[in-house]
């Protein structure tokens, strides 16, 4: 799935298996893990489910509950909420080091709980944004590095590779759960009053996220109890407020030093352009949360099961990512990114084709199964359901090819001893994608307005052309931005 956390979870080198028993042992070794590691997996699932439900609801809530236009809602999400999360995530790593893992966990969840409560109870725009959306971005960002740190801390060296693989899988399961929750609440459309308060459908979705957030507190408590002996040995002396204040200055200094160190290197400019191009692919992934819900309501019908549709991507990535990785180990990361980018872009073009071309497919056995059995629809199946399924299937194949290899490429070309510095740039494609998706509100308003004639195929053509920028740019500028990868033989 398309989030920076998903790309940061790169497992360390695994211990080579020795025969069948060794291979099986790589999986069963996790059964002996500490209780805290399993609690970390639970926390990851809960945190990512709550985040994904909120993410899918955000643009609909901004427009229908707060009254923002498509353009304003897109700008708030693309140029405010999403980039703020990226920036705060970069700061959160140092904060975790300064105040400790437990405090960061509690701080992040507490901020999210207060922020979600505000978003549930108010429809005053300035209050919802300043006391809800912005603090939520801070709270959500605190969870990313602390979960990675917890996974590393609570796993042994032998368990570490499988631990990171499992937490990646748990993240995808959380994404899938959010899709089903999103559709269920929207379809239920239950209207109820709670002490005179009648929440909208979108506030009900935020209530689900809030309930999940509250459940996280006891999980952290038990994690804390199991960590007491280790915590005593760490002997952190920094107070919470002092740690935060110290972190702001420390992180700013480290960031300046990082870029000073990198700017003078020839590989830095190349990896920068490489990541900027990848940002166009990330924008297409992000539109599934920030554009697709409105497309579904306006083209497919109010309450369309867009969550289940989007889950096609999640299911396929869980299956395809390890298979593609195993079958393409000998290919260079750059070549894999180009191939994957071409496949992804071709998938988006499916959505720009005439819907009449898919009427037969909609009436076929596959179309009936997709619409009636998987999506739970009644009556005739709109061709866009079939087109979306085909688009997501093709896009998922491309994502399985390119997504894991993007960060492998950064590590492969990094000068020795600077792998972490180059890895810190891993958030750049998502940041670029989020900035690009901020313009989607104007595209949505132009081609799929809430009222008036609609031309969805033109919107998807624009998205397809945008996705094509990445593979075309990587091919055209290959001789300028490609750097030989350590251990690869197909760099010519």
What are these regions (language model features)?
Residues 31-82, 270-277, 281-295, 299-302:
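Helix-loop boundary and gating motifs at the non-cytosolic
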Residues 161-190, 210-213, 425-440:
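Glycine-rich segments within core transmembrane alpha-helices of 12-TM secondary carriers
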Residues 110-124, 343-380:
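C-terminal ends and interior cores of transmembrane alpha-helices
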Residues 68-82, 292-318, 382-390, 421-424, ...:
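Loop-to-transmembrane helix entry
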Residues 1-34, 157-161, 182-289, 293, ...:
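Intracellular loop-helix junctions on the cytosolic face of multi-pass helical membrane proteins
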Residues 142-156, 400-415:
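Intracellular juxtamembrane helix-capping segments at the cytosolic ends
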């Amino acid at each position: 799935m398309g989030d920076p956390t998903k790309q940061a979870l790169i497992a360390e080198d695994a211990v080579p298996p020795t025969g069948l028993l060794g291979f099986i042992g790589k999986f069963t070794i996790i059964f002996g893990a500490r209780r805290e590691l399993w609690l970390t997996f639970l926390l990851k699932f809960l945190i990512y489910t709550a985040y994904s439900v909120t993410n899918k609801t955000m643009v609909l809530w901004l427009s229908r509950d707060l009254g923002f236009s498509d353009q304003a809602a897109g700008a708030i999400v693309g140029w405010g909420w999403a980039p703020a999360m990226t920036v705060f995530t970069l700061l959160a790593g140092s904060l975790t080091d300064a105040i400790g893992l437990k405090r960061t966990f509690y701080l992040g969840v507490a901020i999210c709980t207060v922020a979600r409560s505000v978003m549930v109870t108010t429809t005053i725009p300035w209050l919802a944004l300043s006391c809800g959306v912005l603090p939520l971005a801070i709270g959500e960002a605190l969870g990313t590095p602390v979960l990675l740190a917890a996974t590393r801390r609570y796993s042994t060296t032998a368990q570490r590779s499988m631990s990171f693989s499992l937490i990646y899988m748990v993240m995808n399961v959380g994404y899938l759960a959010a899709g089903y929750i999103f559709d269920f609440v929207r379809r239920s459309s239950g209207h109820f009053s709670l002490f005179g308060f009648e929440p909208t459908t979108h506030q009900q979705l935020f209530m689900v996220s809030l309930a999940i957030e509250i459940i996280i507190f006891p999980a952290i408590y038990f994690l804390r109890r199991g960590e007491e002996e280790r915590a005593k040995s760490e002997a952190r002396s920094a107070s919470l407020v002092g740690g935060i204040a110290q972190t702001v200055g420390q992180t700013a200094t480290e960031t300046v030093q990082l870029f000073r160190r990198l700017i003078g290197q020839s590989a830095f400019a190349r990896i920068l352009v490489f990541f900027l191009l990848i940002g166009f692919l990330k924008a297409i992934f992000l539109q599934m949360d920030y554009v697709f819900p409105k497309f579904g309501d306006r083209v497919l019908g109010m309450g369309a099961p867009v969550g289940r549709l989007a889950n096609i991507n999640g299911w396929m990535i869980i299956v395809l990512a390890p298979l593609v990785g195993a079958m393409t180990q000998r290919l260079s990361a750059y070549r894999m990114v180009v191939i994957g980018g071409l496949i992804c872009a071709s998938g988006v073009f499916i959505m720009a084709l005439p819907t009449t071309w898919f009427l037969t497919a909609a009436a076929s056995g596959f179309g009936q199964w997709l619409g009636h059995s998987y999506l739970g629809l009644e009556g005739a199946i709109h061709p866009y359901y079939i087109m979306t399924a085909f688009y997501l299937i093709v896009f998922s194949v491309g994502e399985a090819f390119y997504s894991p290899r993007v960060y492998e490429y950064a590590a492969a070309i990094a000068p020795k001893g600077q792998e972490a510095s180059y890895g810190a740039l891993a958030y750049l494609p998502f940041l670029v994608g989020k900035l690009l998706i901020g313009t989607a509100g104007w595209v949505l308003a132009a081609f799929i307005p809430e009222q008036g004639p609609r031309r969805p195929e033109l919107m998807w053509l624009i998205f397809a052309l945008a996705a094509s920028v990445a593979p075309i740019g990587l091919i055209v500028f290959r001789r300028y931005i490609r750097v030989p990868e350590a251990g690869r033989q197909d760099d010519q």
